Amino acid sequence: MLIIGLIILAAPVLSVYMDKAGTAMFFYSGKAHGDKDRKNRIVRCVLSMMIFGMISLTGYMNGCAMSKQERLAEELDGQQPGGIEGKVYEIRQSGDEWRVYVYAEWITFGRGDSEETVEYRGRSKVLLYMEDVGSLKTGMKLTLSCSLSRPDSADNPGEFDAREYYSHKGIYIVGKDISILECGEDYSRIGDILFRLRIKSGEITDSVFGETDGSVIKAMLLGDKSGIDRDTKKLFQMNGIAHILAISGVHIAIIGMTLFGVLRRLTGSYMASGIMAISVIVLYGVMTGMASSTVRAMIMMVISVIGQVKGRSPDMLTSAGTASVIQALIDPGIILDAGFQLSFAAVLGMAVPGALMKKLIPTKNKVVSTLVMNLAITLATGPLVIFYYYQFSLYSIFLNLLIVPLVSVIIFVSIVVIAAMLIFPGILQGNEMAVGIGAFPVKLILAIYRQLCEWAMKLPFYSINTGHVSVMMIVVFYMAMVGVLILLVRAKSADCARVRRRMVCLCAAVIMTLCCVCYEAASFDREFRVVFMDVGQGDGILIRSGMGVNILIDGGSSSSNKVGEYVMVPVLKFYGAAHVDYAFVTHGDKDHVSGIQYLLSDTNSGIRIDNLVVPMYGDIENMGELLELAEKRGVNIIYMDGGSQMSCGKDAAKVWLNFLHPSEKTDIKDANDLSAVIRLEYRGYSVLFTGDLGEDGERELISEGGDLSADVLKVGHHGSRYSTSGEFLRAVDPDLAIISAGENNRYGHPHGETLERLDACGADVMSTIDYGAICVEITDGGISVTGYR
């Protein structure tokens, strides 16, 4: 039965990759093997083959439809005016913005700058961003004009990729600047009732529990995470308990199975109570947005209820496998969704390692049993958490032991309070004492959650930043983990001492393999690299040595207010940089320091700075706020003078950083021309960083007589017309020039004259506008350059 369940669960994953080759590979075997009743085996096999054929055909057709939609989206070149005809299937509010999901039957838009238009007929999902939905309702047919584009893609490693995220949900096109031309009067009555119920429940939640706690309750009950404040979200994420914010099996079990039990006692009928409970759960799923974890839990609950109606007990693996097949049939792309994978990994954790560990540690103690199950779930989901989020909370196992049991209390009490406010609004609206008593248990538990997380964050190694790992490492880890558990179970049950010794030896070998995998994961992708992050209009450079030394040179943006949170932290975590050894600041402009200020101010970012390095004779006045913040955080401040140098690493892998400018002799007042100039040397290659240095600063630098030659030049002042002069380029003689600038910036960077000068000196030019983040790797074999886009 275990093998059958694993095959069922793995089949949809195979289907996604097989669809790309033109063949769907779904497989559902039910109970054709291992069933005690062998007489009907042939019938079950034939039925399984028929189901296999139908699922294969459906999977192939869905895969083809998704491919067509993806190819249609690729026709879009930036923002293009277009039109849509379709039907609204979901309306959701996110902060001050509304997101309207439409099944489009007809899409048209212009092709580039030409007058040619692209027209597509066929059902496809489109996401519309609107400031106000007015009288728009679920189920309405509409015709509209808008600006169409593809969702934004990630420009940096580790950054959130909206294009990939929405593609997993079958959405390849988004629309903005909406103008509704025609709107039908018919709409879904049930959909509208659920929409209004969701909005009203959210308002009640905010009024009863307060804005902060209410946002958490809305996430847990209504699937609305838009109101959760940044600090709460990070607190839960860093401690490995963010999963409680997603609607999953716990919620469905509490709502659905409790309702089923109550109705069964009231009606005395399994069938009637089952139908009513399933109907309520389906409506609840629709109201909360049908997230992948919600759908999985709903399907498994339906199977469980049907099993009880039929007098049979469902198998967890078979139920999970069936749920995965159904979800993959509806939307094959969801298999690659992180939420989908984590949801099923948790179920598998209970079914496979959980079952094996219970055999290893048989106990009637509920605390020990719960701890064992938490460990099993952590082992199952941990590798995926590392793969997607590049970090792991060491104490999450123990926190979940305390936190998860109380989730049911939060859900139950919250539902009772909200239901009471909906049913008896006149009685409870002004009764603050009654409402306060009802809300008290929830507010108390959430306060305990926060306090536990804050205590955990004060412990050493509370969060381990692993960096990105390969898929193969994840696969090997799972194989080794299951292998170790199976061997230990067999060794424990073996009667012969010799067999037990062999099992233990095999187990030791597998553990050694697992340790090697963990070591490889820890040292994965550790080549020396210089990453020019795409921060928009600004500068942000990460230097990561093979010895694990992390250096930042600037980090800020004038075009993105949250460059530290949304760009720098993800990039640092992607490369496993839990701390920055040295953060160099060339000068105090916002587009060079705003991200570093964020790292210094946000203690929950998971990144710390050890040393802040600033020019002794540079733009110190504009760095006042930055220096004050660094002192407050206990960061060591180093003042560097022109002509000084520092090194890190050993022997041939030593990295030299030469501080060339400004010095005590520098006679310039302009803040940009006082930018720190740093020359990096590694294995005979060099990179020159110039901040916002202009032509006057360049002449001053040349007159000081230092070695300016470099293989790679970070072009000064984002490619400004008044920077990177011909004289300076002759002194540097770069093979590669990298420009960091924002797309469609108001300064016109990089300027055409600057590009002409770079071309004349023979340097290859790469810009973050065109390539996104640019990674320069230096090895014994030379320099290699790759763009992230």
Question: What residue spans do the PLM features occupy?
Answer:
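Aromatic-rich juxtamembrane segments at the membrane interface
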Residues: H168-M298, V305, L379, V531, ...
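Membrane-interface helix/helix-cap signal primarily in integral membrane proteins
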Residues: T58-H243, E565-P570, Y617, G624-S647, ...
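Active-site metal-binding motif and surrounding structural segment of the metallo-beta-lactamase
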Residues: G546-I551, G556-V614, S703-S720, D733-I738
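Core dinuclear metal-dependent hydrolase active-site scaffold
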Residues: A328-L336, E454-Y582, E631-S709, D770-R789
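Hydrophobic alpha-helical transmembrane segments in multi-pass membrane proteins
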Residues: I3-G22, D231-I397, V413, H468-F524, ...
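N-terminal leader/targeting segments
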Residues: M1-E74, R296
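Alpha-helical transmembrane segments of multi-pass integral membrane proteins
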Residues: M350-F461, D735-S740
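Cap/insert and terminal regions of metallo-dependent hydrolase folds
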Residues: N611, E698-G772
